[in-house]
């Protein structure tokens, strides 16, 4: 998750309510995008998983599959110069053929 422009098929999960990210994912899928990636780090990881599960089970049952799940960590430098590791997750989902 590098800084800069975000690709149009990526939903970055943060501090907003889960349904905001569900709506963003559904909007992308309804616009014809066949694959999207849900990305989060730190405490937002559980919200990213919830987003995928809500899209997959409540809104588009039997139409979405999880393509891949990538986990990792990033080194983040705080304002006072300390470095810490933050966990990351990227969940790729796509429409079933």
Swiss-Prot record:
Domain of life assignment: Archaea
Protein source organism: Sulfolobus acidocaldarius (strain ATCC 33909 / DSM 639 / JCM 8929 / NBRC 15157 / NCIMB 11770)
PTM-bearing positions, type N6-acetyllysine: 15
Chain's gene name: albA
Molecular-function annotations in GO: double-stranded DNA binding; RNA binding
GO cellular component terms, semicolon-separated: chromosome; cytoplasm
NCBIfam families in UniProt: DNA-binding protein Alba (TIGR00285), PRK04015.1 (NF003088)
Described purpose of this protein according to its UniProt entry: Binds double-stranded DNA tightly but without sequence specificity. Involved in DNA compaction.
Protein name: DNA/RNA-binding protein Alba
Family: Belongs to the histone-like Alba family.
Example GO BP: chromosome condensation
Keywords of this entry: Acetylation, Chromosome, Cytoplasm, DNA condensation, DNA-binding
Localization terms from the record: Cytoplasm; Chromosome
Post-translational modification comment from the UniProt entry: Acetylated. Acetylation at Lys-15 decreases DNA-binding affinity.
Pfam families registered for this protein in UniProt: Alba (PF01918)
